[in-house]
């Protein structure tokens, strides 16, 4: 199979997991209960753990390898600042789409990076795709629940999944010979994800007199550790 078709399929699947997460949220008709509340908090922290693993094992290591100290610091801090400004802007708008916007804000640069690194290192490309898929599932689940006033929630998530192949193919053709730009984008995304985790996800892990939900973060990070282990 031509490499570009592999990129299209892999990046599309990575985006489709957000839709799968939304479908799970849609078919959930159970009554609110302590168990359900723990599960929902656990899904949130699972996504946080996977995001941290993506930063630790896929995004920042590429920046450390390809960038000197100053560009590395600038891109990482810029990513955090950009997500901070986006978060502030959404709060001013009182937007019910913060989780969905955050999903797109980290998915698109990651997909561009996926396409860019695939030509030089398909193994890293598949590894990055696995991280994107794992993080998009709980993000899609949470985004669907957040968009409770929107009548076309699944359509939005399906449309978001199609942005993956577009971004990945763009990265493949435009950035495959620009490893430093690709590494900068990955580090930028890493900084943004770190902001997202500690601003939005970690505070939601706290549930009074319940101690299991934060273990979702450990499980999510373990998924990343196992991916790194088997990749090597």
Where are these predicted regions, by residue range?
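Intrinsically disordered, metal-sensing/regulatory segments
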Residues: 1-232
């Amino acid at each position: 199979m031509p490499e570009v078709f592999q990129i299209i399929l892999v990046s599309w699947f990575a985006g489709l997991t957000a839709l799968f997460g939304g479908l799970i949220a849609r078919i959930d008709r159970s009554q609110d209960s302590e168990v359900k509340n723990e599960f929902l908090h656990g899904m949130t922290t699972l996504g946080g753990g996977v995001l941290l693993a993506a930063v630790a094992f896929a995004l920042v290591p590429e920046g450390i390898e390809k960038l000197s100290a100053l560009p590395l610091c600038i891109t990482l801090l810029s990513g955090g600042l950009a997500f901070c400004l986006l978060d502030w802007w959404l709060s001013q708008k009182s937007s019910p789409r913060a989780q969905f916007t955050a999903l797109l804000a980290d998915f698109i640069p990651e997909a561009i990076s996926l396409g860019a690194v695939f030509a030089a290192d398909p193994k890293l490309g598949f590894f990055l795709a696995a991280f994107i898929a794992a993080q998009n599932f709980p993000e899609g689940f949470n985004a669907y629940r957040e968009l409770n006033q929107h009548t076309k929630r699944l359509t939005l998530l399906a449309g978001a999944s199609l942005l993956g192949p577009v971004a990945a193919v763009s990265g493949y053709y435009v950035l495959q010979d620009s490893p430093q730009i690709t590494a900068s984008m990955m580090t930028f995304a890493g900084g943004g994800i770190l902001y997202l985790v500690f601003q939005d996800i970690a505070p939601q892990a706290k549930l009074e007199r319940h101690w299991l939900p934060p273990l979702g973060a450990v499980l999510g990070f373990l998924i990343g550790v196992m991916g790194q282990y088997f990749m090597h």
